[in-house]
């Protein structure tokens, strides 16, 4: 097994930065994961390795056929054939979705009139679908961070509870999902252990899919793809080339950096190019035409080659010129010095406007370094992982970040008690989940799995799963419920293996007060322009955007606004709340 792993990944597929002592790296990392949990998302910076033999591209290498995927109520309605099918007692035909108190509940599908295909794929039988639930190794980065929120036992109990609930509600053609805990054997940055664990999941557990994986190496999901096993929520900063490489097995819950940077670039071109830097902190800059610089994360060797080439072409097409283009590696002990060097370069370049496309830790040091040398430009937020959250924004130099604005794929925040995952759990079970802090994080990949299996139809394969999600009716599009869609309905580049498919506009208000994503009261918050209005990914923002205008902006909602409120249904028959 060891020799096979080494042969598949001669370069290891691991992060390029040097090993860092546990105490030195855990401080900022604990903060980040606490935020991730509160926001209901886990973000990783993703390294890519060769696909190895047998990995599908665009689903072409996956065996099985997309024929026979489920018919949704929306499809039948468009064809005028709804009367030809049995939609089951759980379908609300007024919405075409299951009777669940959710915005964007799973779609209704026509009940199958024939037995399912039985053992259609590894991990699939006529009655069960085996799914691995990845548990990080004790003492590893993810375990240590998660310990600051909910215990592994509480999270696993909540996973099993959601699985039991969805098995009762979502029709899976006579099958039930069986979640099997899988204990990782190595750290989150160990590619050899990651590949060995993937082999165990595929060949020992015979899993159809894995929920989660190691956060600091792509070896696990790459190997699962090679072995034709799905991996959901295994990496959320994957460049689009990574999704193409591992298709149809890898699925994410945040837009690819390709999507975010393209949308940010279009905002820059439509709103900023050729105009004075009126939002800069230095008065002398406000009467100068904007000059642009970019600061972005990368690895050694670079992993965003295709994306960088695309952006270079787009820069040329729009006549946008960068006076400085800075890249850095995420080596935490070196970030303060690296930030000081970058800040000096930015000031020397006379850039009025800095486009930031990196991790959420670097701005802590970069804004401090810029302030130390009296450099106060405009900061353009591209929505890369967590830089668009109030919890992190409060850690950036406030004199600097008072001039930050841009895009975000995240929804306008709601109070934790209003989180959809929590209200759904309480609707079914009549009590709070064991993992109350991580409940949103836990539900997301489980729901994606169930919906994909539901839409795949009776002959379940990875390709049918892919085609089912590609045909899923898109949901959402309101301030608190981003538009979710995949394939042709997701964010470009297409077909999409991650979502949301829209974004909103934000700016930092250093004087606003309220609670952040963790529920902590404080000063400094992101404001959402025009009440958090969403814009389709891949399309320019029209008109003139008035950043730094409080009129019409919000920092959050006490409850979902009209149009984004979930429907109300009685308890599901047989649920604990209904006395079952």
Mark where each language-model region is:
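C-terminal region of N-terminal signal peptides and the immediate post-cleavage residues
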Residues: 36-65
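Extracytoplasmic ligand/sensor domains, especially the bilobed periplasmic-binding protein
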Residues: 80-82, 86, 91, 96, ...
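Solvent-exposed, acidic/polar segments of extracytosolic/periplasmic ligand-binding ectodomains
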Residues: 66-118, 122, 474-580
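Beta-alpha junction/loop-to-helix N-cap segments that form part of ligand/metal-binding clefts
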Residues: 153-160, 168-246, 253, 328-336, ...
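N-terminal extracellular/periplasmic Venus flytrap/periplasmic-binding protein-like
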Residues: 58-200
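Extracellular/periplasmic ligand-binding modules, especially the Venus flytrap/periplasmic-binding
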Residues: 349, 359-365, 410-475
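Extracellular/periplasmic periplasmic-binding protein-like sensory domains
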Residues: 247-255, 369-444, 551
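N-terminal export and membrane-targeting signals
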Residues: 11-36
């Amino acid at each position: 097994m060891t020799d096979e792993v080494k042969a598949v990944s001669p370069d290891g597929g691991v992060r390029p930065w040097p090993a860092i002592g546990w105490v030195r790296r855990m401080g900022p990392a604990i903060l980040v994961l606490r935020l991730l949990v509160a926001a209901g998302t886990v973000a990783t910076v993703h390294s890519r390795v060769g696909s190895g033999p047998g990995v599908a591209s665009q689903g072409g290498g996956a065996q099985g056929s997309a024929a026979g995927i489920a018919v949704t109520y929306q499809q039948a309605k468009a064809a005028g054939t709804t009367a030809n099918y049995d939609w089951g007692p759980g379908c609300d035909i007024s919405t075409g979705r299951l009777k669940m108190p959710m915005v964007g509940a799973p779609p209704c599908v026509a009940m199958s009139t024939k037995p399912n295909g039985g053992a259609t794929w590894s991990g699939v039988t006529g009655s069960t679908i085996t799914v691995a639930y990845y548990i990080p190794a004790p003492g590893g980065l993810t375990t240590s961070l998660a310990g600051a929120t909910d215990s592994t036992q509480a999270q696993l109990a909540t996973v099993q509870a959601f699985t039991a609930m969805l098995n009762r509600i979502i029709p899976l053609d006579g099958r039930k999902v069986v979640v099997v805990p899988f204990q990782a054997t190595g750290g989150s940055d160990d590619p050899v252990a990651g590949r060995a664990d993937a082999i165990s999941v595929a060949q020992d557990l015979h899993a159809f899919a894995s929920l989660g994986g190691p956060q600091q190496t792509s070896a696990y999901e790459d190997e699962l793809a090679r072995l034709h096993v799905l991996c959901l929520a295994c990496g959320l900063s994957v460049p689009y080339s990574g999704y193409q490489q591992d298709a149809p097995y890898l699925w994410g819950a945040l837009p690819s950096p390709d999507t975010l940077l393209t949308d940010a670039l279009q905002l820059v071109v439509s709103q900023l190019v050729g105009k004075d830097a009126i939002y800069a902190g230095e008065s002398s800059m406000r009467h100068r035409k904007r000059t642009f610089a970019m600061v972005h994360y990368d690895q050694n060797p670079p992993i965003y080659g295709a994306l960088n080439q695309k952006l270079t072409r787009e820069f040329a097409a729009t006549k946008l010129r960068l006076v400085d283009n800075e890249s850095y590696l995420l080596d935490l002990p070196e970030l303060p010095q690296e930030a000081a060097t970058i800040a000096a370069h930015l000031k020397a370049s006379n850039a009025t406007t800095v486009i930031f496309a990196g991790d959420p830790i670097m701005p802590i040091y970069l804004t401090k370094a810029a302030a130390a040398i009296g450099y106060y430009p405009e900061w353009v937020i591209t929505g890369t992982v967590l830089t668009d959250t109030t919890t992190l924004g409060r850690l950036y130099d406030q004199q600097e970040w008072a001039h930050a604005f841009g895009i975000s794929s995240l929804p306008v925040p709601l109070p934790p008690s209003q989180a959809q995952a929590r209200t759904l759990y309480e609707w079914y079970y009549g009590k709070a989940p064991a993992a109350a802090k991580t409940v949103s994080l836990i539900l997301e990949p489980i729901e994606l799995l169930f919906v994909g299996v539901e839409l795949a139809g009776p002959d379940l394969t990875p390709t049918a799963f892919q085609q089912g999600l590609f045909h899923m009716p898109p949901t959402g599009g309101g301030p608190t419920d981003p538009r979710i869609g995949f394939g042709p309905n997701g964010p470009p580049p297409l077909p999409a293996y991650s979502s949301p498919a829209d974004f909103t506009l934000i700016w930092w208000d250093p004087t606003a007060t309220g609670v952040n994503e963790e529920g902590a009261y404080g000063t400094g918050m992101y404001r959402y322009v025009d009440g958090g209005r969403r814009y389709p990914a891949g399309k320019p923002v029209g008109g003139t955007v008035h950043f730094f205008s409080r009129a019409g902006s919000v920092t959050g909602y006490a409850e979902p606004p009209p149009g984004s409120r979930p429907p109300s249904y009685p308890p599901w028959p047989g649920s604990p709340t209904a006395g079952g």
